Each structure stands twice: as structure tokens, then as C-alpha cells.
Amino acid sequence: MADSYRKLIIERLEDVKQRNKQTATLYNNYSKLAEQLEKKHKYGTSSSNSSQLETGELARVKEEMAELYRSKCQNDQRLIDANHRIADFEKKSSAIIAEKIALEATAKSICAKYAKTEVELQRLKVDNDQLNDERIASNTTVTMLTKQIQDIENDRIHFLNKIRELNEQRVDFLNAEVALEEKRRNSRIQDMITSAVQDITDKDTKLEEMLRAMPDTNSNGDLLLGDSVPSRAEFVLECEEGEVNDVHWLDGETFATGGSDRNIKIWKVDGHGGYTRIGTLAGSNAAFTRIDYERDRKHFIASSNDKNVRIWNLDNSRLLSTLSGHSDQVTCVKFYQSHSAVSGSADRVIKIWDIQNQRCSRSLFPASKVLDVATNMGASPSLFASGHFDKKLRFYDGRSTDPVRTVDMGGRITSLDVTMSGCELLVSTRDDTISLIDLRTFQTVHCYSAENYRTSSDLSRVVLSSGNEYVAAGSSNGSIFVWNRNSTKLEKQLCSNSENAIFSLSWNPTGYGLLSSSKQKFVTLWK
């Protein structure tokens, strides 16, 4: 039985030897021991049968047998250890094989992705070529369209020049019509003067003495007879097709109106409760908002809702220039120093214009809608003021871009008017109050208000009388309030026949007579 096990072990070791060379030495040693053991076994059997062996030899053989068994045990242990190592090696080999399989799968996946990427790259190259072709075609189209735009722009400029020429021709025709009307009017006046002179037999010496005793004149050169508080309506003039935004005396007998009908009309008072239109200034494409007059050069300036400022020569009613540059309606304009003007707009920009060169010399950015401007301040010829929607009164020096002083008011500032001395400024605000500010200290000197007084609009205009004795303002209910400048006492409340809001007032340079314009095309002379 032991021999069969031994043979089985030897056969398995032989098989392991063939598969693994690392156990060859172990196998050889075990084979030798097995052969020696078998020889001893045979030798021991033959000796027992012959009974001739000596007892000492048998003991030696037993000792060798014991030694062989010990060697066998050691070799068996080594075999077990070798089997364990073989098992470990097989596990590691299996892990390596599994890892190899995984790596091969990963390699196949990477190769597939690479092939897919190659296909995608090829597709992108094709798309890129197509896009490049489209880009070239687009550039060609853009070049062609740019040329077309340039041609259209050239045509637009040509048409604008043509329109300008036609407008100039239209203005020339209007000027010719005005000149003809002026000539006819002068002829009628000359006939009237000739007829009147024939009835005069002697001079009124008393009147001459009275006029010599009154040498005072206002800043416009008109004889200042003294401020008089008006009490009645001399006449009511229906002059525009809509709102009359501004009215302005040019001298003691002539005044101008401007509003929604896009024309400025010049009127003359005959002194007997009547009036005559003596001229028309045209050229605007929208309603006029503010007008101003420079008597020395007979220049008339007006701001308009068509974003422009225009200047006329009043002698021949000829349009001298159109000042463009604002991006929104121009709310106000005033002559400023010599050969300059200041305009304010809803685009939150103040522009100083060089009238001679017909260009903007400086732009100021107060960051708020401009509602009115005031010039001719006595403190400095270059100083001017602007009233704004953000309730701030800003003072500028035309030589710099930042305000030199800012005064906070109680409401949106609708109107500014400077006293004859240039030392005080009248300010109207939407909180239904009017303030008189000392320009030397920038402090409020007087405040004017009344129970029924309501500021009519953001562009309503208040005025000082020619002699600076009174303050006048129009209300939203159609009434006109007159205060004493120094005492702030309400001297008079003039009530019109309608309840249309009063937009603008202008006091006659002689101090006798107040013009008012309303929302519904009416102008009233109060005396």
C-alpha cells in the first residue's frame, strides 16, 4: 500500500517537474530517497530470510531508515511549501492574465475611439473647408453690401443736400414773401404817416419836456416808464394752431410767439388795443420750445423739439444757421456772451455754440434733463445757470466742464430769470414756489407762493418786471399771479376767460404791459 502511494507521489512530482522546472531539484532528491528506501527494504527482506545479518548492521540500517524518514518529512514539507508557492504563482499568473485581458480590451476600446476620432476629425476637416468656403462667400457678400451701403450713403447725402437746397429755396421764397409783405406794410404805414403829418400843425412841447425828464432805459434801450401792475386784458390774440410755448417782447411795441405750428410769428402793437402780424420765421420741423432775441445784432434764436437750434436775422427774416448736435428735444436756449449761445436738452446735455462758425464749442454733461438756462449774470460774463429735472440748480463757467456751484431746490426747476443787475436769479420749481437767489451768496432771499398758484408745466416760464419791482407767474388754472419783489406780497391775480394753463410770460421793456401765452393758442396782453 505504501509503495502504491509512493509511486503515485513520484508520478505527480514527475508531472509537476515537467510543468515547473523550479521543483526539479526537489523531485530529484525525493526520487533518490525513494530508490534508496526501496533498496533498503529489499535488502532488509533478504537479510531476514537468510538470518545471517548481524544485529549491528540491522541497527545501522534502522538508523539510516529513520534518517531517510526525517529527510522524507522535510522533503514533504518542502513539497507542500513549493505547492503553496506554485498556487501563489498561479494566482498571480491568473491575475496577470486577467489584467492582460482587461488591457487588451482597453486597447481595443482605445483603438475604436481612435478610429472614431479619426472619422470625426475627417468630418471636422470637411466642415471646416465648407465653413471656410462660406466665410469667403460671406466676405464677398459683405464687401458687396458695404459698397452698396456706401452707394446708398452717397445717395442719402446727395438727397440731403438736395433737400437742403430745396429748403433754402423755400426759405428764400418765404423771405421774398416776407420782404414783399414788409414792403407793402411799409407802404401802408408811409401813407398813414403822410396822412397823419398833414393833420399836425405844431409840436406837443409838453410831451417833449416829459420825455426829457424820464431818461431811464432798460437793458434793451427801451424807455423804462416804471413798472406797472396790469389789471385788465388789452386784447386776446389767437395766433397758433396749438400750444403757444413761449412769448417774448423784442422792443416796446414788437413781440414774438412760438409754439406747435412750427413757425415764429412777429407781431406789432398799434397802441390802440390792436395788433398786426408783421413777419414769420420758418424752418423748423417740430414745435418751438424757447425763443430769445439779441437786439444789437437783430438776431433771433429758438430751440425746437426737432433736436435743433435755429438763428434768424430779424431785419430780413432770413434763416442764418441751424445748429445740430442734440439727440433729443431742445428745451431751452439763450444768447451767451458775444457770438455764442447756450442750449439745454432732454438728452441731459448742455451745449455752448459758436454762432460765427456754426459749431458746438463745448458740451457739458450734468446727468439730468435740462429744463431752462439763464445767462447775463453780473458776477462773471462767462457764468451761466441751468435748471434740471433732478431738482438741482447748477452754475457753470463756460471755460470748464464741471459746475462751479450746485444748489438743491425743492422741486424740478421749470424756469430761470436774471434781474437787471445780474446779481439775483428768479427760480420757479414744480413744488409751486418761486425763489429769488442772491448770486453772490447763492442763498434764497425771497420765496413767493399763493394758495391757488400751481406751476403749469415743466417748461412754464416766470418773469421779473423790467424794473425788477414785481414777479409774475402763470398758473395751471389760467390765472396770472403778480407779487411784490421785495415784500413778497401778492399784488394781483389776473383771471383769464379760460382755464387753460399759462405757459409763458414776458414783461414789456417799458414796464407797462405783460404778455401771456396759454396751452390753447391764445396770447393775451395785460395792461
UniProtKB/Swiss-Prot annotation:
InterPro entries: ATG16 (IPR045160), G-protein_beta_WD-40_rep (IPR020472), WD40/YVTN_repeat-like_dom_sf (IPR015943), WD40_repeat_CS (IPR019775), WD40_repeat_dom_sf (IPR036322), WD40_rpt (IPR001680). Gene3D superfamilies: YVTN repeat-like/Quinoprotein amine dehydrogenase. Most likely a component of the atg-5-atg-12-atg-16.1/atg-16.2 complex, which is recruited to the preautophagosomal membrane and associates with lgg-2 to promote autophagosome formation. Although its role in autophagosome formation may be distinct to the role of atg-16.2, it functions in a partially redundant manner with atg-16.2 to regulate autophagic processes. The keyword Lyase does not apply. Expressed in neurons, pharyngeal muscles, body wall muscle cells and intestinal cells. The gene is atg-16.1. WD repeats lie at residues 239-277, 283-324, 325-363, 365-406, 408-447, 454-493, 497-527. Keywords: Autophagy, Cytoplasm, Repeat, WD repeat. This is Autophagic-related protein 16.1. It comes from Caenorhabditis elegans. It is found in: Cytoplasm. Homodimer (via N-terminus). Most likely a component of a complex at least containing atg-5, lgg-3, atg-16.1 and/or atg-16.2. Interacts (via N-terminus) with atg-16.2 (via N-terminus). Interacts (via N-terminus) with atg-5. Interacts (via WD domain) with lgg-2; the interaction is direct. GO terms for biological process: aggrephagy; autophagosome assembly; autophagy; macroautophagy. Belongs to the WD repeat tipD family. GO terms for molecular function: protein-membrane adaptor activity. PROSITE patterns: WD_REPEATS_1, WD_REPEATS_2, WD_REPEATS_REGION. Transmembrane segments: none annotated. The keyword Repeat applies. One of its GO terms (cellular component) is Atg12-Atg5-Atg16 complex.
